[in-house]
Amino acid sequence: MNIIRPAALVFILFSIAEPAWAIETLGYETVEEFNGIEIRRYDEHLLASVTVSGGFKTASNSAFRPLFNFISGDNADATKIAMTAPVLQSPDTPANSWIVSFVMPSGFDLATIPAPTSEIVSLTAQPETTMAVIVYRGGWSRRLYQEHESELYDALASTSYAPCGDALWARHNPPITPSFWRKNEILISVCPTTSEL
């Protein structure tokens, strides 16, 4: 009887699952790389968002259902909308509130996207934006997020780029992905420093 070692089984499952997750991702151009981070110019895009209260990890769970329902046909046209990556999360006011967003496929704009049926789902158009980005692998803990957020701010401190917005947390993989394979990013909008203007 052949016995497949656990590590080999995980590799096989990942190899099978990975092509199924080959979905559209938010488009960007890499402008510069330094200090372990990237400066990217992101294409204009459309977000479907829900604002929720709760902890860092529970916010995405609370927001997932209304967002998933929206792309599954809970909209004015009963149209199914393709899932994309990444899923974005950012802080909101008051404290302990979060905005969780699905990126809409690039073929949609505010004129063509079907209106949400749920009042808690909002649609916003995002302009082309320059962002500093750090990529890391690992679980979805707040500790890892804060460690890499600090690393990103430190990397920007001595450059010609200044943060000019809140940090976004971007997750690229479904929850079934083993934590050590999960691709995560932290993104911060950046502007030229005064000396560069």
Describe every region a protein language model picked out.
Residues 2-4, 13-197:
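A solvent-exposed interaction/effector surface
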